[in-house]
């Protein structure tokens, strides 16, 4: 079994390799100043534009949905999309970004693998090519980021869950939490804290019995939930920091009499399978809430910015450091506004 400390050490080792690749005998790129325009000059026709999309992973449906939406946009507008996923490895991601640049990328969209560990790497990359971050950014680098307000999304979901428990006559609950991987230094912690803040704001006290990584994947979330429930069968809530892990937890407790009083919620994502459970269960269902985190909205905005820069409509300095997609909690009372069975995600 790999411990948290072991995973962290492995991540740090990988980042040291990346740093050596960048810095060893000098920097790959001669300046730290951010790129002021497209890497290969302004393209008058969008069909001449090449966009590199460096995704951190594809294991979770949320990230896979980003790829689907990005490919749809590229087909609709006619630009070339170079898409690579790094399996959460910063060294792999660096190599992929360099490969995209050598293949003629004018701009990059990047979902970073490590908020803290990629600063030097991304400073240098962003000096050569305009970088728009999506979902996870490296603060202080790149031209802008498009992401979810994870703290607010988590809080809104937590408030909905708090109200459900209060409706059941409970103002104090025990819970277990399904977390992200060791490299999840920003998104997951914000989702976690936001949800807990929402419980508090909603008038519910909580006790965290256990936390375990589900790697943002349903199958691993299911295993982690089984492990935690084995020692804590009487908890009130399984919280997943995304719907995929929460769905894994749902699979563990659904239909099992010993877990009749165990409910499930997610901090974020709004995955259609989770929304279907919220809709079918109604206000007495086992899957209580989640938060809107649309991969399509994020991809739309990140690619809009990238194309505007690549075609000279705007320059990198025109954009704020960060912008956020719509933040809202989703529960039984507003499910019809957000559930689309035909959605990509």
Region locations from a protein language model:
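Hinge/cleft segment of the Venus flytrap/periplasmic-binding protein
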Residues: 12, 25-43, 47, 178-182, ...
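Extracytoplasmic "Venus flytrap"
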Residues: 32-43, 48-69, 73, 82-93, ...
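C-terminal motif of bacterial Sec signal peptides marking the signal peptidase cleavage site
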Residues: 20-24
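Flexible loop/hinge segments that line or gate small-molecule binding clefts
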Residues: 116-152, 168, 174, 271-284
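Hydrophobic alpha-helical segments within soluble ligand-binding/sensing domains
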Residues: 93, 146-173, 220-222, 270-275, ...
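Short beta-strand elements at the ligand-binding edges of bilobed clamshell
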Residues: 83-85, 138-163, 178, 280-296
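Hydrophobic alpha-helical
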Residues: 110-125, 195, 213-277
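An alpha-beta-alpha
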Residues: 51, 55-57, 70-72, 157-203, ...
